């Protein structure tokens, strides 16, 4: 899984015709960033100083993330081998990617 800058990277790459995103959805934690922290002793207040402009257009990605073109659900096989890479290589050898 990825989030933050990873969300941004996947979102940008999906705009290219030759890119096929394989895996699981990103985490969707890109809308607010550059957090500052104020320490009050017993607690801390953390707040963002940047906000993605897409939030104003109702197109924020909080809790949505970026959906892959080909979803590969997580499984225990991921502990043993790189399932995502294996699928990508399979698609390349089949010639079925963009």
Task: Describe the predicted segments one by one.
Residues 1-98:
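C-terminal "post-core" interaction segments
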